[in-house]
């Protein structure tokens, strides 16, 4: 019944995913109702389901369609009362934010920074963190100072401007959720406290690997780097995510909703300087 729009799909459309062969229907996530099943005992017709990753939209046709044909092993049943637009905002984006939150081992006293705060994952992370850890002090970075008010409304306590990959602050942080990736990694580490954790989750900076990185001299003593890969998914973790959203009354509604006929406009918005939060397409 719907799906999220992701920057990785824009990268693929632009030709940066070398393993993808065209023509190909894009789309790495979806939510909906099973209309036909070859495993009716586990996923009978009428079941509410989620699917993400697993080479959907890459090795085989993805979710930018009215119907999606998926391998049974990547179809996950979920129990949720969310409406379709909100449910469509959850799978890839909130799953990534949820995994990042767990890997950072957040404590109430932490000063937490999100690099790439206005992205879908950045906004989702803010909502999850403030739902479960309301006392943690949350900072968000953005290249566009004009998004400050919207970031504060989304749950950030303070906003820091990012100038070409360098944060305009002398502050250091206990935990950093880095959604920019390798292009900003050195600067992120420079703002990580001793004993702090940085979780690299995204590649919004458009760079896939870190050049000339010496783990001894560049990381710094007592600092920790981890990562989260949203392709590592199972039904239990997805249900735990939906349960958390319900338990803490988290508003997971998307920022923008488009129709199936307007996918081009949806990608254009996500790729624009005005983009904020999660963008979804609903097919009802």
Task: Please give the residue ranges for each predicted region.
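C-terminal hydrophobic helical "lid"/dimerization subdomain
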Residues: 99, 233-284
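Glycine-rich beta-strand-centered segment in the early N-terminal region that forms part
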Residues: 1-4, 14-56
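NAD(P)H dinucleotide-binding glycine-rich loop of Rossmann-like/cofactor-binding domains
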Residues: 51-116
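Glycine-rich phosphate-binding loop and adjacent beta-alpha segment
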Residues: 151, 183-250, 283-284
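Mid-domain Rossmann-like dinucleotide-binding core that forms the NAD(H)/NADP(H) cofactor-binding site
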Residues: 87-164
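A short acidic, Gly/Pro-enriched loop at the edge of an enzyme's catalytic core
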Residues: 168-176
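NAD(P)H cofactor-binding loop motif with strongest signal on the N-terminal glycine-rich segment
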Residues: 37, 117, 180
């Amino acid at each position: 019944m719907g799906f999220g729009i992701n920057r990785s799909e824009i990268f693929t459309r632009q030709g940066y995913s070398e393993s993808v062969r065209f023509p190909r229907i894009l789309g790495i996530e979806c939510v909906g109702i099973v209309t036909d099943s070859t495993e009716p005992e586990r996923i009978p017709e009428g079941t509410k389901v989620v699917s993400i990753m697993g080479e959907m939209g890459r090795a085989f046709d993805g979710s930018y369609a009215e119907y999606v044909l998926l391998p049974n092993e990547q179809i996950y049943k979920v129990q949720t009362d969310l409406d379709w637009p909100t449910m469509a905002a959850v799978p890839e984006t909130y799953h990534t934010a949820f995994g990042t939150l767990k890997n950072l081992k957040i404590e109430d006293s932490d000063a937490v920074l999100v690099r790439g705060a206005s992205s879908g994952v950045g906004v989702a992370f803010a909502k999850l963190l403030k739902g479960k850890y309301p006392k943690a002090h949350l900072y968000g970075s953005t290249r566009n100072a004009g998004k400050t008010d919207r970031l504060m409304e989304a749950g950030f306590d303070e906003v820091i401007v990012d100038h070409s990959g360098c944060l305009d602050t002398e502050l250091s942080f206990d935990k950093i959720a880095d959604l920019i990736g390798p292009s900003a990694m050195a600067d992120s580490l420079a703002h990580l406290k001793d004993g702090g954790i940085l979780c690299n989750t995204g590649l919004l900076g458009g760079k896939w690997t870190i050049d000339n990185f010496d783990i001894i001299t560049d990381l710094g003593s007592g600092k920790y780097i981890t990562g989260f890969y949203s392709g590592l998914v199972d039904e239990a973790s997805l249900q735990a995510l939906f349960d958390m959203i319900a338990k803490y009354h988290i508003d997971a509604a998307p920022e923008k909703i488009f129709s199936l006929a307007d996918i081009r406009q949806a990608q254009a918005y996500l790729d624009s300087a005005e983009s904020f939060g999660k963008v979804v397409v609903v097919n009802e």
